[in-house]
Each structure stands twice: as C-alpha cells, then as structure tokens.
A protein has these predicted regions:
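C-terminal segment of classical bacterial N-terminal signal peptides
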Residues: 1-8
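N-terminal (or domain-start) structured segment
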Residues: 8-98, 134-135, 143-147, 155-185, ...
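An extracytoplasmic/periplasmic, membrane-proximal ligand-sensing/linker region
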Residues: 13-16, 157-160, 241-298
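Hydrophobic/aromatic beta-strand patches that form the interior of the parallel beta-sheet core
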Residues: 19, 103-104, 113, 166, ...
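Short coil/turn segments
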Residues: 23-25, 81, 116-121, 140-145, ...
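Hinge/capping helix and adjacent helix->loop/strand transition within the periplasmic-binding protein
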Residues: 41, 65-74, 87-171, 228-263
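C-terminal lobe and pocket-closing loops
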Residues: 108, 186-256, 285-288
C-alpha cells in the first residue's frame, strides 16, 4: 500500500547551479559566487556559478535557460531588473507569461555613463551639446535593457540623436580606449582600473556614488530619468517553498557578511538583502516607471 508513495529527498541533495547571464567579473557575478560558496559550505552539496552571456540579447538567453529548467530549486537565476520587469513583455515566448518569483534583491549597481578622458565634454549637458553637431557612438548591454533605454530617453529629452549604438557583452576600459564607443553605460566596477583616465558624466543611481561624489545622478540632470538598477535571485514560480527558504537564508547571510560589505565599499555598490515580498513590490513599481520611460521614447 505504501509502495506508490515516493520518498522526497530533503533539499538540497544534488548540485545547485546559480546562473549569471553575463561574463565573469562584474558585481552580480562576484556576489553570486560568494552566495554559491557559502551555500555549498552550509549544505554540503556542490554549488557553482555558470556564466551564460547573451551577446546582443543581454540577460534574456540566460533567463530562458532558467525558465526551461525544472522548477526544483536546483537552477537559480541571478537577474538584473530587466528580466522580471520587461522580460515577459518583449516577445520572448519562453519568458511569457512571467515565469519567475524573486527570492530577494541584493545589489544596487553603481551604474554610470562614461567617456574617455580626451572627450571634449565634461558633463551630460556638454555631451548633449557636442552630440548635436558630432556623431557619438553609444555602447550598452542590450537595446531593451533599462540603462540603454534611459540613455536613449536622455538623448530625446536633450534634443540630440546618438550617431550609432551597439550592444557589448562587456563595457570596460578597453571599450573606450579602443574607440569602439564614445560613451558607454556600464558599472563602475568594470571601469575601476581606469577611473583616473576616463570621465564619469552621470550615474544611473538614486543617490550619488561615494567613489564619484562630484558626479550627478541622471535624475539630477533630468528628474524624469530617475531609476535604480538592481540584481536579485529568482526561481521559477513552481519552485517548492523549502528550496526557496534555504536559498534565501543562506544568501541573506552572505550579503550581510563582512566580505560582501567590503566589496560594496570598494566599488560604490549597495549590497543588502530585500525580502521576497518587498522585492515583488519593487518590481511592480519599476514596471510603472518603465511605462513612463516608454512614453518618453515614443
């Protein structure tokens, strides 16, 4: 009579994958690796980060992989704001309707707009004026992504057009030094090695970044463009609560740890843990903000 009753193993009993849809090295990757290391140490199963850069597709190819994996807690997505906010609205069948629930948001990026040191402008306003009579190339992480849309919206509100724009897997010191782009939107982490050799024109953050205190936020330049860029952990909506709870408990401890907070201090990022309910509310608020941004771009 009991033969047909499966015995469910306690989670986790096999390796756990944390999928980061970007190349190694940026903040979400570094922090997710900390999460995986601590989860492995706590639970005694292998836990590893797998990087799945999407090229011009940004984080969405990686998100598709998480969406199509079994909803058992063994594949966890480490996703930027764009995946839950717009991923199910941009004609990607595998991501619609919305597939993911947040476990928690843990990172606010020190996102910036940067130019090379020899650029003939020192501010967003000067750059806009220069761009009215000179073609400037914008480098970004993907056309649908929020930093890209903010950069395009700024051009529209400031009365100029980008000469060209292109997506890159990584936007760093080499992107500017090689001349592949005149202006890039990227994270401060990726340009820290050359911070003294470039110009930070604005930050796409809610407050000024401590490492660049003289640089205004884009919201200071134009209040309509005030938005925060974050990263969080996500699982498929059908993932069991037991798995969610264990991932959350471990990740929260990691984010509040000394090494995670040191990374925040060193890079200008904000590192914290926002619970699932508050994260879901943040996503709703950001969807409304994206609607307003879309109206600016029409």
């Amino acid at each position: 009579m009991l033969c047909g009753t499966p015995v469910l193993a306690e989670y986790p009993d096999k390796p756990v994958t944390f999928l980061v849809p970007w190349p190694p090295g940026d903040l979400e990757d570094v922090l997710t690796r900390m999460i995986a290391e601590d989860f492995q140490a706590e639970h005694g199963v292998a836990a590893a980060v797998v990087n799945k850069p999407g090229g011009g597709g940004g984080p969405f190819p990686g998100a598709i992989e998480v969406a199509n994996a079994p909803a058992d807690g063994y594949t966890v997505g480490s996703f930027v704001i764009a995946v839950p906010v717009i991923g199910h609205k941009i004609d990607i069948p595998d991501l619609a309707p919305a597939k993911f629930d947040p476990l928690g948001i843990f990172l606010t990026y020190p996102f910036v707009l940067a130019a090379s040191a020899n650029a003939p402008y020192n501010s967003m306003e000067e750059m806009a004026e220069h761009a009215k009579s000179n073609e400037l190339a914008l480098g970004h992480f993907g056309a649908p992504l929020i930093p890209t849309r903010v950069s395009l919206a700024y051009a529209k509100t400031a009365g100029f057009e980008w000469g060209s724009e292109a997506a890159f897997d990584a936007l760093d010191c080499n992107t500017l030094a090689s001349g592949d782009a005149d202006v890039i939107n990227t994270t401060l982490q990726l340009v820290l090695p050359c911070l003294d050799d470039i110009k930070i024109l604005a930050s796409i953050t809610d407050e000024r970044i401590p490492l660049t205190p003289d640089t205004p936020t884009l919201g200071e330049v134009d209040p309509r463009l005030s938005i925060t860029l974050w990263n969080g952990l996500f699982v498929h909506k059908d993932t069991p609560q037991e798995a969610r709870d264990k991932i959350i408990a471990s990740a929260k401890k990691t984010m509040l740890s000394e090494r995670a907070q040191k990374l925040a201090k060193d890079t200008g990022a904000a590192v914290y843990w926002t619970d699932a309910k508050a994260s879901a509310a943040q996503i709703v608020a950001d969807q409304e903000a994206m609607g307003s941004l879309g109206e600016l771009l029409q």
